[in-house]
UniProtKB/Swiss-Prot annotation:
The protein's name: Insulin-1
InterPro entries: Insulin, Insulin-like, Insulin-like_sf, Insulin_CS, Insulin_family
Similarity comment text for this entry: Belongs to the insulin family.
PANTHER family given in the database record: INSULIN, INSULIN/INSULIN GROWTH FACTOR
Keywords: Carbohydrate metabolism, Disulfide bond, Glucose metabolism, Hormone, Secreted
Subunit and interaction comment: Heterodimer of a B chain and an A chain linked by two disulfide bonds.
Function recorded in the entry: Insulin decreases blood glucose concentration. It increases cell permeability to monosaccharides, amino acids and fatty acids. It accelerates glycolysis, the pentose phosphate cycle, and glycogen synthesis in liver.
Source taxon at top rank: Eukaryota
Cellular component GO terms held in the UniProt record: extracellular space
GO molecular function, one term: hormone activity
Disulfide bonds: C7-C36, C19-C49, C35-C40
Natural source organism: Katsuwonus pelamis
Amino acid sequence: ISSQHLCGSHLVEALNLVCGDRGFFYNPRGIVEQCCHRPCSIFELENYCN
């Protein structure tokens, strides 16, 4: 799966899909920098799961 730019509600939806029941730690500054301003991968998204 390729890296993608994910912003706003798309980013939250992606975190819900990747993290599922684990939930996630939402730190807007860090994740927006990593996944919205630059493309990020599913593996990078998993870093934000609880």
